[in-house]
Amino acid sequence: MATSSTPKYNSNSLENSVRRSPGDGINHEQNDEISRLPGETLITDKEVIYMCPFYGPVKGRIYVTNYKLYFKGEEMEPLITFAVPLGVIARIEKMGGASSRGENSYGLDITCKDMRNLRFALKQEVHSRKQIFEDLTKYAFPLSHGLLFFAFQNEEKFPENGWAVYDAMTEFRRQGLPNDQWRITFINRNYELCDTYPPLLVVPYSASEEDLKRVAAFRSRNRIPVLSWLHPENQSAIMRCSQPLVGMSGKRNKDDERYLDIIRETNGQTSKLTIYDARPNVNAVANKATGGGYENEDAYPNAELVFLDIHNIHVMRESLKKLKDIVYPNVEESHWLSSLESTHWLEHIKLVLTGAIQVADKVASGKSSVVVHCSDGWDRTAQLTSLAMLMLDSYYRTIVGFEVLVQKEWISFGHKFSSRIGHGDKNHADADRSPIFLQFIDCVWQMSKQFPTAFEFNEHFLITILDHLYSCRFGTFLYNCETIRDKEKVREKTPSLWSLISSEKSKYTNPFYTKELNRVLYPVASMRHLELWVNYYIRWNPRIRQQQPNPVEQRYMELLALRDDYVRRLEELQISNSPKINRSTTSPSSPSQMMPQVQTPF
């Protein structure tokens, strides 16, 4: 077994897709040391043959730490190396047996959550893979083995505390809350009303605490309609909640009906409240059999119900699986378009974007308050509210604003990250797993392609978020809700992903960004305008990867750096000449008009 002494830490430690050569998707490295994070220790290592789908068998050694699997090749110049955070691993299987015949038929198959698979062949000796298999399984699935996530062992230090990015009260004040129509309630401060909601909620001013409790009894998981966003001018609101507990008998709840009417009355602009049910109509009807359902317009006469036809988590999971099958390891050029169409992935992206556009347009142009829900209000609901808010509010299109949006609409409102991603859990076939958050980020990327100057962050920012959605290096996406995060003391014991991003902000900044206040974005959601996100889904294929870095973006960055250098030198020149200017203006023999004003052309 390898020793656990730690080499000197490199802040640019290899992880996922760092330090690639320009020409392919494999990392090439000459350094003999394995870079490790503070708190990362080496567990074991083993000679293997990496069955590379692009270059064939590569002899080398894999190193397993408490955070990542690291492969370092031999016999090639330059060396092929890559690292996979253990949290990215979905499944580890043994390949072949002691009696297997054929070259490289004995080893390990590793399925990853980030669109790639790995295969390692080992020497066909007695128990030659036993130790490496057990160590990999133990540290890749810590919850299944009674261990802590690496985030709790991570000793990285950052200049800024990313946990301070989002403060609910600060965000409420930014939106002009509370006001004469809306109040902040502390009814959930101990998670007593709803254990998957945040402690602070915004509700209509005229709704009492008792009203909220009675409404909670009629909403799935007690997830009552609460405010997500308030339009600064027309005071239309985006509300989020779960489905009503109507059931097969078509139950009614006068408190819930009155509560939704109060929401309608808060803006006074329209006579109707629009309820967006993210589900297909048939699914919403089927939910009545399990006690759920939807708002009957007879019971809610001042509301309009619209179904958005977005499919459930199981359909999305199968769609991503089909997409992975066609993009890794090889792309079949002759049937590419038909194969992509058969996955229905872009169709699902279209439906999510279309739904969010409807929500945003109803609020901005229709000046109507809206209520958004799906079944439990933590999957499709989060997609719709956060995308609509991104379209409506330019603040969320900044780096910090987007972090606030994710913390608020996804993390604090109980999107089940642990269940959907399967953090630390070996049960790869769990039916709760689904790429809901990935779909959201994909939709954001689609918007950034259509509005290249509207977002302060770049593509690398979005990919970094997705990489650490799986990595378990940070506490940001761990667990299903704030109740559990508070219990596990995540904020106190783990670093935040936003700390990393704030420490290297220039890496994640879009050089084409132009700040525009009060601009509403309406992306085109037709199939002709949507693209497969090649730089994410096919980034592991060296033959498909697009040129990195983008030459236009690279040149623009160089020009910006040149401009900044000119501005700096100009400021230094002005400072150094300042005493001379002051003396000349007080001297009768040196009129001030003889000294020209120094200005920058930028």
UniProtKB/Swiss-Prot annotation:
Keyword Cytoplasm: yes
GO BP term, pick one: muscle cell cellular homeostasis
Biased composition (Polar residues): 1-16
Binding site for a 1,2-diacyl-sn-glycero-3-phospho-(1D-myo-inositol-3,5-bisphosphate): 287, 312-313, 375-380, 416, 420
Subcellular location, record wording: Cytoplasm; Cell membrane; Cell projection, Filopodium; Cell projection, Ruffle
Catalyzed reactions per annotation: a 1,2-diacyl-sn-glycero-3-phospho-(1D-myo-inositol-3-phosphate) + H2O = a 1,2-diacyl-sn-glycero-3-phospho-(1D-myo-inositol) + phosphate; a 1,2-diacyl-sn-glycero-3-phospho-(1D-myo-inositol-3,5-bisphosphate) + H2O = a 1,2-diacyl-sn-glycero-3-phospho-(1D-myo-inositol-5-phosphate) + phosphate; 1,2-dioctanoyl-sn-glycero-3-phospho-(1-D-myo-inositol-3-phosphate) + H2O = 1,2-dioctanoyl-sn-glycero-3-phospho-(1D-myo-inositol) + phosphate; 1,2-dioctanoyl-sn-glycero-3-phospho-(1D-myo-inositol-3,5-bisphosphate) + H2O = 1,2-dioctanoyl-sn-glycero-3-phospho-(1D-myo-inositol-5-phosphate) + phosphate
Full protein name: Myotubularin
Native species: Xenopus laevis
